């Protein structure tokens, strides 16, 4: 990417800092099984769900100057947009995790049940994966 950018060109990146922060309140084993499945899915497919922890150093080593970095994510109560986004992600990806043996169908069924119970009480929340946003610039 560095070689393809013009001098002064900007590279904006949004990547996982960590998926390990991902949890629900109250905690539930099916939620934790899903979080582990996400991590293993990335690892099994050449990815790294902790890339954000060392991405700034990789960018600097390549010659970029880091202009901005911040983290997003955090608490998402029931019906928050991130709550809804993750619900949809679970429903879309969990069957793949089950098919690949990364989580059991029982865990998936329990996760759906846990999610519905949380939505009904309106007191539950998730603490989402932390994502790092980086703006890096190629030297002039």
Per-region residue spans from a language model:
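A short glycine-rich, Lys/Arg-flanked "PGG" loop and its adjoining helix->strand segment in the class I
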Residues: 1-10
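Generic preference for hydrophobic/aromatic residues in regular secondary structure cores
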Residues: 2, 23-26, 126, 131
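Short acidic-hydrophobic sequence patches enriched in Asp/Glu that either
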Residues: 5, 26, 30-34, 85, ...
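Conserved catalytic/acceptor-binding region of the Class I
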Residues: 10-80
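Conserved Class I S-adenosyl-L-methionine
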Residues: 49-53, 60, 65-140
């Amino acid at each position: 990417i560095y070689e393809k950018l013009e001098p002064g060109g900007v590279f904006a990146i949004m990547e996982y800092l960590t998926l390990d922060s991902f949890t629900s309140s109250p905690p539930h084993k099916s939620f934790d099984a899903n979080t582990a499945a996400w991590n293993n899915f990335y690892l099994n497919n050449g990815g790294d769900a902790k890339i954000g922890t060392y991405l700034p150093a990789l960018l600097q080593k390549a010659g970029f100057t880091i202009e901005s970095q911040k983290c997003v994510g955090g608490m998402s109560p029931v019906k928050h947009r991130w709550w809804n986004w993750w619900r949809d992600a679970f429903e879309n990806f969990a069957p793949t995790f089950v098919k690949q043996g990364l989580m059991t169908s029982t865990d998936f069924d329990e996760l759906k049940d846990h999610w519905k119970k949380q939505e009904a009480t309106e007191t539950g929340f998730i603490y989402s994966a932390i994502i790092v946003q980086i703006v890096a610039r190629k030297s002039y």
